[in-house]
Amino acid sequence: MKKTTEIRNIFLNFFYEKKHKIMDSSTLIPDNDKTLLFTNSGMNQFKDIFLGFKKPKYIRVATAQRCIRVGGKHNDLNMIGKTNRHHTFFEMLGNFSFGSYFKSDTIQFAWELLTSKKWFDLSKEKLIVTIYYKDIESYNLWVEKTNINPKNIIFIKDKNNILYNSDNFWTMGDTGPCGPCSEIFYFFGKSINYKNIKIYDEEYIEIWNLVFMQFNLHLNGKLSRLPITSIDTGMGLERISCVLQKVNSNYSIDLFKKLIYEISKIIEIKNIKNYSLRIIADHIRSAIFLIYDGVIPSKEGRGYVLRRIIRRAIFHGNYILNKSCFFYKLVSPAINIMSYIDSKIIKKKKEIENIIKEEEKIFFFSIKKGMIFLNKNLKKIKNNILKGEIAFKLHDTFGFPIDLTNDICIKNKINVDEKGFFHAMNEQKNKSYKNSCFNKFNLKLLNNYCTKFCGYSYLKCESQILNIYNLKEEIKEIKENQEGIIILDKTPFYGESGGQVGDSGEIKSKDGVFSVIDTKKLGNYFYHYGKVIQGILKINNKITAYVNKIKRNKISLNHSSTHLLHYAINCLLDKNIIQKGSLICEKYLSFDFSYGKKINIEKINEIENIINEKIRDNVIIHSNNMDLKNALKIGAKALFKNKYKDLVRVLNIGDFSIELCGGTHANRTGDIGCFVITNFSKISSDTYRIKAITGETAIAFIQKKFNDINTISSLIKSNSNEIVNKIEKITENLKILEKKNKNLKNKIIKNYIKLIFNKIKKINNFEIIMDYFNEEIDKIILREILNKVKTNLKNGIVILASIKKDNLYIVTGVTNNLVNIITAKEIISYFKEIKSIKGGGNSYFAEAVGVVNLIDLKSMFKKIFMILSKNLK
């Protein structure tokens, strides 16, 4: 019996002999495709080559690619353990050609590897091949180039009569490279029932998919030929091992048998066929390689998928098999078994073990509480459906992923209201939008002390760590790559409030560095959210806090500018206008206000001018603390009347602006430098929003606009003072020319149509029009002529061509009542058989291009007419 590792080597050695470059597997995190959570097939690392964005280093390649199929389009998580075939982690063996060889060689390579005694030596009678029903070329090659029994070839049609929606037509997405494929199945039974072959029954297993990438799929659903054809094949290692080792389940191959045996020893269970053991065995493989490739358990993205996998396995060990912390103990034996995939993983064994151990500890305490809550609610269930909000509380409070809740409920013959679950999740997301990075932490509001804020005067200070939080609880220390929240006894970091975003920067101790991503003030404390980028930080550590100076300065300039904007609006529009909302960050400021009248661009320019005048005045910006009553007496604007304490901070800009404000500001208006309004819009019936930029950002914006004007002036050969007039004239002339062009085009079409009906040839009752232009005609015009001629035919075929300097463009159309006899696509295929041209289409319309001289075109027309004469008898 061949071992799985031997089978893997045989595959790679076979293609090495066929002049393929054996390349390493890419990581499970795609670096060239943001649309993918994980690498889920062998072709992912070559996607840019298939799309034509990148030239291949090698034109023949073979790989053993590690893959994950959880989340997104390919999600096998809920199938694990229930079927003999599915895995979240597997290896995909594949051979690839980038313009080197195509269908013929691919089919011959596959047949040789599978059936030759030198290689896999599988019985030819046991192999079934499925092909796309329109891919006659592949069928002929299978029959001619191999000794397969034609009975063992099955045509697969489109699903729901949707063109190219077939298991045997592979697409990369809604558009892009695509093509038919040949899928190879192995039959486990004794004899094939040729009258009723059911390839999706358990007796059959798909072992290899050969994808022939020869087309480009367009948004309109049409296909065009790719300039270079490619090959992408995929063979699941676990599946081919299942066949070659003559076992009915992937979980019975040597690798899984060893792994399941090791797991059964660790968790002390004798029944190695237990359903939960399959899940645990599969999930430990995924968890190990995800962590090896840089994923850490978390509450979102790839980290959350890893968390789901780990927690599902823990649950099956803890709840089903009654074992406490065990999952991390599987890391060592699993790596020993799987190190053939990448030997470097051995050095990461301890690190992977620790990460899983930490996650297991966190979840272990939640399982018991979660199960008490779930069991309590299961007793109250009506109609055998668990409410979505209950499933969401299990997810949100106890860390139960939805698939885990599903597993438990299925065991109790209960369905989960998944629609209600996702509704509850979306509701919470909407509520917590503003505080998204903090709401994932289970924070206590502490009232026995308060963080002292020194950020008005200092951007650096010495302090001490009071508390540290991870996702669920207060912890004593936080390590490298862990995210969390740190609370200090004193901070220079401004906490988000009054529309101003929180500060970022660094917190440094002698043993570690914590990167502060955001800061928020909750209760009496400032919460610093971020991630440890070096070392470790502990409670009571003495630290130095550093605010990001550049970011803070930009925010301060924008905040002072918001006050100037408020002043200018009051001066120009209405003195009673009050700010309705604002956002002040380092990139820009936005200011919302209510006003019942229309505001034109001239008013916006005036507002901008008032602000820049005050900036040039370079007046002092200063603040002082006073009691609320006195502040209101001296005319300070209070935007949030019910939210102020008795002692308030009053901000003065010169003698013209006075507001209650807790934000950070410039020292003088001149520090702002420049103020530019970039956007002005109405966000509701009576509310306007102004967006603006300041300082260096504003200067860069003005410079770009100036450069754009110069470029346009140069292109239209005008000086900048006359640019608008010149563009208006160009636009007017363009409209006139477009009208003339349209009239001329219509005349050409009209005149030609009159002449062309004299050229009708008849075959029985069918009307045939074949004509060409000995000049280059615009493709759109030629298509229009074809459509108009076709509408005037009752029962006919139209073939039109334009040719100039041997460049041929040909279109063909067939009336609706003829497509059952002959299609436009078939007619183009006849042209392609006569001469090497490229094209395609559908039943009613098809087109092609190529290099053909006039003599050859006339000859082609004669031959096509003869073919049509035979077909239309």
Swiss-Prot record:
Keywords: Aminoacyl-tRNA synthetase, ATP-binding, Cytoplasm, Ligase, Metal-binding, Nucleotide-binding, Protein biosynthesis, RNA-binding, tRNA-binding, Zinc. It is an enzyme of class 6 (ligase). It comes from the Bacteria. Its EC number is 6.1.1.7. GO terms for molecular function: alanine-tRNA ligase activity; aminoacyl-tRNA deacylase activity; ATP binding; tRNA binding; zinc ion binding. It holds the Pfam family tRNA-synt_2c. Zn(2+) binds at residues 559, 563, 661, 665. Its main location: cytoplasm. The keyword ATP-binding applies. Homotetramer. This is Alanine--tRNA ligase. It comes from Wigglesworthia glossinidia brevipalpis.
